[in-house]
Structure formats: structure tokens, C-alpha cells
Amino acid sequence: MLEFSSQDCVFMQRALDLAAKGQYTTTPNPSVGCVLVKNGEIVGEGFHFKAGQPHAERVALAQAGENAKGATAYVTLEPCAHYGRTPPCALGLIEAGVVKVIAAMQDPNPQVAGKGLKMLSDAGIESTVNLLNDQAEKINKGFLKRMRQGMPFVQLKLAMSLDGRTAMASGESKWITGPDARSDVQKMRAKSSALLSTSTTVIADDPSLNVRWDEFPENLKTEYKKEWLRQPVRVILDSQHRIQPTHKLFLTHSPVWLVSSEPRDLTGFPDFCEQIIFPKENLLKELMRELGKRQINTLWVEAGANLSGSLIDAKLVDELIIYIAPKLLGDNARGLCQLPNLTKLADAPLWQLNELEQIGDDIKLTYTPKGV
């Protein structure tokens, strides 16, 4: 087993903190941070900000200048070895005279997948991997799932009362949770490559399903400038072609993909609206594969009980995020999700609680499927 020093951990943690700064802007690329250290001092550091812009290693090398020669590089993901929008980072480290590279994890991207480490090794540079691997995985869980399985990382968001209700019997649901929880939802949307909902939700609430910087938590506004705002793709299941160009969805100039089993005439819709056509059978799984092909890393789901239950039933939910408000709505109010195929308690899906956080008066619970 490889042994790393406490100093190695400190510098890699700094690289991870830098990588996290790119979580709102890098999609479809991974979020990566890099720290260059010489004689125990940081001589250069940086993170990848946006696709097409310099990678983290290049930013750190530019800051270090001549001091990069003889330095150790701490990078949160294996340096790339291929020519894309930017030159290979492994080559940049070699040319700068870096003598050692420590990577938090190997890159599963088939274009990299060990090739970066091999390029470094072939050049005589000592390279090791798997320092603070779990933290590195968490930062890029969407990118990593897409690389490994060809599908996005699916986060299902639900908001409910203490008695597990999401809306009154009439459908009234604004607002179950408080302003702080809704602000947190804006933050989660901002991290996502795409949002998934249904025409039923759109018709009932006429939501914009966009990211609103003014509603961000105050601490996020200081690190994520308004001019950097990136709107996620809105993916809407619309089997009966009920979505119309007058919906608020289309007031935000960001792609809208309408999903159904039959084509429709999009006359009158803005040019950023398009259709995705699938047969009804296995529509959700086929949609996930298609979203993976379209480089969607993380999919944030805001929908009603039907789609929520269908995603859970199909085992497509990677993370279940529940906001619980300190309210009681009674047994006539609407339930959390529909699971019509579930008839035995022994068959109920089990979930592992990973995080519990108080947000204002509400509680945020984050679960992952147990045993997966």
C-alpha cells in the first residue's frame, strides 16, 4: 500500500478545495484542482474553470513559472494525455520540469485512463495515485458515472412535510419549505448539467426551472459571480405534447429538450427547443443513455410523485435529497412518490443516510441506495 505523508494530505486537500470552485462551471468537463509545491512551499496553484479554458495544471504552471522546475504536482485527477480543446496536461508538466506527480485518482475517461500516468512515467517522472480518493470521487460523481456507465448521476429532489406529504389535496404546494431551503435548491440546480421534470409539473406550476443567482445563499454569491451563471438544460417528459411556447420555461434562453414517443411540430417554439424521441418501452433508461451521450454529467430531478416513483422503481436514482419542513398536512394531502409495483414491505427499497443538515427551519437529508 502506498504511504503518503501528512504534508501530502495537506497539499492534496488544498487541490481538492480548488477543484470544488469549478463545480458550477466546468460541465461537461470534470472539476480539477492542482497545487505545485517546491521546498515545502506552494509555488503555483489553479483550478479548471470552464470547458475550452486552461486545465488546472496549466493554470498552476503559469503561476509558478520557472519555479515549476523541480516541483511536485498535487492534482485531483490524473493529468490528461490527449489533445482536445487544450494540449495534454501531462506533457505540460513534463516540459516544465516537474519531478513528481501525485494524483488523487485515475481518470476513467477512455481518452486518459492511465495514459497520463504512463506518459509521466515514461518521461522519468515519479507518479503515484489514490491520495484522498474518496473526496476526489465526490467532487466529480457526475462526470465519473458518465465515463463509467454512460449515464448521468441522477439526484432526485423531494420536499415534504413531517408526515411525508408534498402538497395539499388541491395540489397547492407553494411553499412547503422555507426560503433557505429554496435557496439551497438554487445552489443544487447551479451544479447540475440538466434538470428533469414533466409536462404535468410545468402545467401545474408554470416554473422557469432555471438558476436564479439572486436567490443563491449569500456565501455562494461571493465565490460564484453573477456573470459566470450557467443555465442547465431543461429536460421535460411530454408524452402528450402539452408543453406550449407560452410557458415560462422559454423565458430563459437555455436549451429545452422535450421528450416523447412521437414527433410534434415545433412551429412557434424558440430555436433552443428540440425534441428527443423514444419508444415508450424503457423510455427512462433510454433517456439516461441519451443524456450521457449528450455529455450530461449530473441530472437534477424536480417532479411529482409519478416520475419520482418511476425513477426509484427503475433503480435510476443515485442520490435522494429530501427537504423536510416542520409542518403537518394531514392524510388527505398528496404523498411523496408512487410505487405501484411495491406490494411487500420486504421489497421496499432501502437507503443509506449520508448527510443531515439543518437549513433554516428545514432539514435536508441526502441518501444513496443501500447495497449498491
Curated annotation (Swiss-Prot):
Residues 151-372 are annotated as: Reductase. Residues 1-150 are annotated as: Deaminase. Its cofactor is Zn(2+). Zn(2+) binds at residues 55, 80, 89. SUPFAM superfamilies: Cytidine deaminase-like, Dihydrofolate reductase-like. Its EC number is 3.5.4.26, 1.1.1.193. Keywords: Hydrolase, Metal-binding, Multifunctional enzyme, NADP, Oxidoreductase, Riboflavin biosynthesis, Zinc. Substrate binds at residues 173, 189, 209, 212, 302. It comes from the Bacteria. Residues 6-128 form the CMP/dCMP-type deaminase domain. The active site is at 57 (proton donor). GO terms for biological process: riboflavin biosynthetic process. Gene3D superfamilies: Cytidine Deaminase, domain 2, Dihydrofolate Reductase, subunit A. Binds 1 zinc ion. Pathway: Cofactor biosynthesis; riboflavin biosynthesis; 5-amino-6-(D-ribitylamino)uracil from GTP: step 2/4; Cofactor biosynthesis; riboflavin biosynthesis; 5-amino-6-(D-ribitylamino)uracil from GTP: step 3/4. One of its GO terms (molecular function) is 5-amino-6-(5-phosphoribosylamino)uracil reductase activity. InterPro entries: APOBEC/CMP_deaminase_Zn-bd, CMP_dCMP_dom, Cytidine_deaminase-like, DHFR-like_dom_sf, Eubact_RibD, RibD_C, RibDG_C, Riboflavin_Biosynth_HTPR. PANTHER family: 2,5-DIAMINO-6-RIBOSYLAMINO-4(3H)-PYRIMIDINONE 5'-PHOSPHATE REDUCTASE (PTHR38011:SF7), DIHYDROFOLATE REDUCTASE FAMILY PROTEIN (AFU_ORTHOLOGUE AFUA_8G06820) (PTHR38011). NCBIfam families: eubact_ribD, PRK10786.1, ribD_Cterm. In the N-terminal section; belongs to the cytidine and deoxycytidylate deaminase family. Converts 2,5-diamino-6-(ribosylamino)-4(3h)-pyrimidinone 5'-phosphate into 5-amino-6-(ribosylamino)-2,4(1h,3h)-pyrimidinedione 5'-phosphate. This is Riboflavin biosynthesis protein RibD. It comes from Haemophilus influenzae (strain ATCC 51907 / DSM 11121 / KW20 / Rd). The gene is ribD.
